[in-house]
Amino acid sequence: MKTTIDMQVLYVTCTVLAALILGYIQAMIIYRLWFHPLSKYPGPWLARISNLYSAYYAWSGDLHIDMWRCHQKYGDFVRYAPNRLLVNTNTGLKAIYGFNKHVQKSTTYNVMVHRAPSSLTMTDPQESAQRRRIVGQGFSSTAINQYESIIMEHVQRLATQLVRRGSDRGSGWSAAQNMSDWGNHFSFDVISDIVFGARHETIGKPDNRYVLGCIDGANIRTSVLFQAAELTFGRVDRYLFPKSIESRNRFTPFVSSLVRTRLQSHDASRNDAFSLLVRAKDPETSEGLSMDAIGGECTTLVMAGSDITSTVIASTLFYLSTHTESYDRVKSELQQAFPTADDVRLGHRLNSCRYLRACIEESLRLSPPVGGAPWRRVVSDGLLVDGQSIPAGCDVGTSVYALHHNSAYFKAPFVFRPSRWLTDSGAQGRESRDIRLAQSAFAPFSIGPRSCLGKGMAYAELTLVLATLLSKYDMRAAEGPMRGIGGGRVGAPWGRHRENEFQLTGHVTSAKTGPYVEFKKS
């Protein structure tokens, strides 16, 4: 008898709880669809009620593509999550990421913090400004010039490896090379050397290449949590992403060992970034960085610094190998600037290679390494964007990929056209206006007080390696089945179908493959 009563009580209790939960979910859906402050903005219906919509596309690596698709369907303002709004205008870019006291980094950046926050993840504007004053000293013009010899050493090592194995045709051309892989190895070697003075030599040795896979693997989980931090409740993410956590647990000790080794060397005279961070003081407060803070900054530098450069190396070579006219113009420009490839160095002659720089800019526009929307939280009195009042407490952002392909700012937005960044002598005023308009919507390194600190070093590294390789070798796209790898595919989902567009899979950093190209000594 007692057992029967207990079962009845349990049944009633479960029924009531289920009804309450169901009622709560229904009320939440009704509120988010019709009464939420962002309810007037269009967007996918699932995105309007749940963060899981954007989390899914983050997991798939298609987040930037879907954001672009949504703008094509719904317009410049898209509700991309219950409490998040996408804005696809140049004025929105400036309002959200410029010097504006009404916004700060979203708390979703907390999912990226491990032990100590870095200049990338800090949400408080004052704390971030102080950290950037210190860390920025490691990326000043003076510091970059000190890193040049390190970069060039790895450039020469890469150049040697690219032609080490010839093709089967015996024509003087190398075997087809996957430039995503080579770019990853080169960029990781450079940033490890610059930050820690560590020589991993993944260009020539496979021993430490596993670290690159760990970075990509760990970032799958991070990219999902950046969209749906609630998946950390009850440690649900541990069950959803066991391989990502395994990758993180391999990568974190690797970086920690680099920090320990560098500290134990007791060599404060080195000019690597680690030494500069140890010595650097905030010019306003004279405060330095703790070891945990330095470790956090170094981890960010290794992950972000290697990814951006490797992605742009691959994308630029993809576009040049498929656009003969642009390739020939770059070759001619470099031949005029440098008698031999050994003469390539930072300075006036490299700066004069305007078409090379335009090719890099156009590759960054078409295939930005970070194509999603870095979310910002609206604070205080709200934010006014293009006449739209966005209330405090909401997240707002601009998809870099979507903005870079907005025809309001870029004519023929999916066409590789480096000349769009150049003003020829005697150009008319309209051409100059077109360039200014394009520049107003160009943000591969973001803009404003939270823009990328390593932008100057990235451009230095990119111009040095691309100028050297294109001066030293002739290059062509691989023939046969490897031709076109890296581009879109006819019949693929909308946004992935363009064969002439270098495709990226976005998981905080960018996974990619190709292009396959062949080299021959000039």
Curated annotation (Swiss-Prot):
Phenotype upon loss of function: Increases the production of AK-toxin I and does not affect the virulence to Japanese pear leaves.
Keyword annotations: Heme, Iron, Membrane, Metal-binding, Monooxygenase, Oxidoreductase, Transmembrane, Transmembrane helix
Cell wall biogenesis/degradation among keywords: no
Swiss-Prot/TrEMBL cofactor(s): heme
Protein name, per record: Cytochrome P450 monooxygenase AKT7
Record-annotated membrane-spanning stretches: 10-30
Main localisation: membrane
Note: Gene clusters encoding host-selective toxins (HSTs) are localized on conditionally dispensable chromosomes (CDCs), also called supernumerary chromosomes, where they are present in multiple copies. The CDCs are not essential for saprophytic growth but controls host-selective pathogenicity.
Top class in the EC scheme: oxidoreductase
Gene source species: Alternaria alternata (Alternaria rot fungus)
Family the UniProt entry places it in: Belongs to the cytochrome P450 family.
Residue positions binding heme: 452
GO cellular component: membrane
Membrane topology field: Single-pass membrane protein
GO MF terms, alphabetically ordered: heme binding; iron ion binding; monooxygenase activity; oxidoreductase activity, acting on paired donors, with incorporation or reduction of molecular oxygen
Location in the cell: Membrane
Pathway(s) this gene product operates in, as recorded in its UniProt entry: Mycotoxin biosynthesis
Keyword flag Ribosomal protein: no
Free-text function comment from the UniProt entry: Cytochrome P450 monooxygenase; part of the gene clusters that mediate the biosynthesis of the host-selective toxins (HSTs) AK-toxins responsible for Japanese pear black spot disease by the Japanese pear pathotype. AK-toxins are esters of 9,10-epoxy 8-hydroxy 9-methyldecatrienoic acid (EDA). On cellular level, AK-toxins affect plasma membrane of susceptible cells and cause a sudden increase in loss of K(+) after a few minutes of toxin treatment.
Catalytic activity, EC: 1.-.-.-
PANTHER family linked: CYTOCHROME P450 (PTHR24305), CYTOCHROME P450 MONOOXYGENASE ATNE-RELATED (PTHR24305:SF237)
